């Protein structure tokens, strides 16, 4: 049986990585960003760390903030309409899983309008085209939505959630910058850190594991075990936050 691993086209890791967003946008001839970020991140100045980079580079953008903790069909529909109105040609997703999931759904529907019924994306939808290019900038360490092909949408009307799996929704660029996570409270740092550790353990123990995934998961377990508790004790220490 063949093993498959899917990765972003490009990823940046480390302090100051968000500065590369402008370089990538220019290199790819992107014209205008559709910035997806939740209201709290905007309120507390986290989103502005990225938009400041865009401003300094003279790059156009529009912010979409109708993001819920568990993104709904309506959030996605509103986002699709807002994206069309913005005349943007790429998405910058800033936040945790909610912003990432909303961005993926918006990007898929824009590129594959025959799936405008959000429910039609449930499961493994037979989309034909890659979604609108997404630059994913996580602000937590737990979901890893910036490097996965999955997203979850809430159907409020039917009181259920559904999972969508689509290789076409993989962000083209992931930007993992510890400065985007430095303002997380201790409780959220602990819970998302444990979430990341759980993913690493599950990835190592799953029957689908193989040599390359073992390499990633064992190293992740080592780093998280070494640094999570220390990052809570020394919350402002950049080295621990970076790990």
What kind of feature is each model-predicted range?
Residues 16, 20, 45, 49, ...:
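Conserved active-site and cofactor/substrate-binding residues in soluble primary-metabolism enzymes
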Residues 26, 55-60, 81-85, 108-112, ...:
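Generic secondary-structure signature for well-ordered alpha-helical cores
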Residues 34-35, 90-92, 135:
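Conserved beta-strand elements of the Class I
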Residues 233-243:
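Single conserved hydrophobic/aromatic residue that forms the stacking wall/gate
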Residues 112-211:
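A glycine/threonine-rich phosphate-anchoring loop and its flanking beta-alpha core
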Residues 1-64:
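An N-terminal, well-structured beta->alpha segment
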Residues 42-115, 230-232:
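N-terminal small/polar loop signature for handling phosphorylated ligands or for N-terminal nucleophile
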């Amino acid at each position: 049986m063949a093993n498959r691993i899917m990765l972003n086209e490009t990823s940046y890791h480390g302090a100051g990585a968000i500065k590369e967003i402008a370089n990538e946008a220019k290199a790819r001839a992107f014209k205008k960003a559709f910035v997806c970020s939740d209201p709290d991140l905007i309120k507390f100045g986290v989103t502005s760390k990225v938009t400041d980079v865009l401003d300094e580079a003279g790059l156009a953008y529009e912010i979409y903030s109708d993001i819920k903790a568990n993104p709904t069909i309506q959030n996605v529909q509103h986002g699709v309409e807002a994206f069309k109105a913005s005349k943007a040609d790429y998405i910058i997703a800033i936040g945790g899983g909610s912003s990432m999931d909303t961005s993926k759904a918006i990007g898929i529907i824009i590129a594959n309008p025959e799936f405008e019924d959000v429910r039609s994306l449930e499961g493994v939808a037979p989309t034909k085209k890659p979604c609108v290019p997404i630059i994913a900038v996580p602000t937590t360490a737990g979901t890893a939505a910036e490097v996965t092909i999955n997203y979850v949408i809430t159907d409020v009307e039917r009181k259920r959630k559904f999972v969508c799996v689509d290789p076409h929704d993989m962000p083209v660029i992931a930007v993992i910058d510890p400065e985007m996570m430095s303002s997380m409270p201790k409780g959220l740092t602990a819970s998302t850190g444990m979430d990341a550790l759980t993913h690493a353990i599950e990835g190592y123990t799953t029957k689908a594991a193989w040599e390359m995934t073992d390499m990633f998961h064992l190293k992740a377990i080592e780093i998280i075990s070494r640094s999570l508790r220390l990052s809570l004790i020394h919350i402002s220490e950049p080295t621990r936050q970076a790990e």
